[in-house]
Amino acid sequence: MNDGNHYRPAISPNPSADTQPSDWAYIAEGGAHIVFSYQGRSKTYATRALRVRKPSATTEPLAQAEENDLFGQWRRNILPKLLPRQLLTTSREVILEDRWYKELLAMVDVVRPDQRKSGIDFAAKGDRRGVLLEDLTSSEDDGAIAVAIEIKPKWGFLPCTEHLHPPESVSIKSHVSRFRLHQHFRGCSDDPPYDPLDLFSGDKMRMRTALDGLWTMWEISRGKVNNWKVFVGGKEISPDDLQNGLLPIGGDDFVTKITQLTLDTLQTSFALPLLKNLQQNLDPIDISSLAALFQAEYPNSPPFDPDLIPDVSAVELNGFVDIYISDPQAGQRMDSWSLRERIIAYALSAIFKDCSLFIRGFLKHAEDGVWRLVSGSDSVKVIDLDLKPIKNIQKWAETDEKVWKYWLETKGAR
């Protein structure tokens, strides 16, 4: 549960002094961070999660300090210009004592996925920063059970045909969602039960189809798919938990109630339309057209040569976001943004294409024995909003080309 957050100043509390590493349970991790949920008895940390950065030998202390400043500026000042604070979680930056930090990471190593264990170097220098976040899976309501769904919706739009290169890609990329292309490329399915275009459509029936498809993918994958996660009473559950009757609510009744909660919450929220606009407006000409602009400016260099794409600074990022919010559709005009601005915009669009929605509500056991949603308890937050390295654009372009070409080779023009 990363930090799409409303930032709070770095003052007390101090997890290293106030808690034991064993008070924190592993939740999940991404490429650069691990997230923990507080399981101890302190009211100060109740309903809190802790996100820590993995130590890496490849990051120099000075570069890490600059990166910390950039990420801090992004959380505190820049991100809230793009997403309203009611969609962001609150957060507080904390400094962790080195021995406590290392003990925390060593303690959870046994439960971490094997594919995530490489790249951590406990000898790496640098400060040990963490971010205290809202634990959106937990509940302080007596007598009510917190239920939550985490959705990673992915790309909610199709690119404009006039900007697609080469011509062979047009019939594919303008009709087949990026999610379907990627699923087919990975060997999963060319017709998955879930399509983001349905979820982002705003049409109730299509949105219901999307949610049913996400349930299906979750069940088929035995809960391993990262597009749909289910939490009950602060714990992530699996399809086995549901099928084996390990929940306080019956399986069929639970699925029905949570699907309706999710659908109603998303329909009354502006989260999906806003994310779609950010995805599309920050990626207005498709990466294939952006690659053509790069090649025109640097004809003797590889596409998106990382040596020609310096890291973005906090000042530069803030400046571009101000340009963007002054005219969000400006990128559709080829004479508006510079190449550098378009690359920054694309890196920002990648954040909103890969973020997650967290829908939460509370169920209470009524006197008639039926579990009912507590009125007004539903909410939606946007999480997993970390900045992505701007140099990743070379990898993104390569992936884009691979997925549509594989579809063409295996399925034809559409």
UniProtKB/Swiss-Prot annotation:
One of its GO terms (cellular component) is nucleus. One of its GO terms (molecular function) is ATP binding. A motif (EXKPK motif) lies at residues 150-154. GO terms for biological process: inositol phosphate biosynthetic process. Its EC number is 2.7.1.158. It comes from the Eukaryota. This is Inositol-pentakisphosphate 2-kinase. It comes from Cryptococcus neoformans var. neoformans serotype D (strain JEC21 / ATCC MYA-565). The lineage of its organism: Eukaryota, Fungi, Dikarya, Basidiomycota, Agaricomycotina. The gene is IPK1.
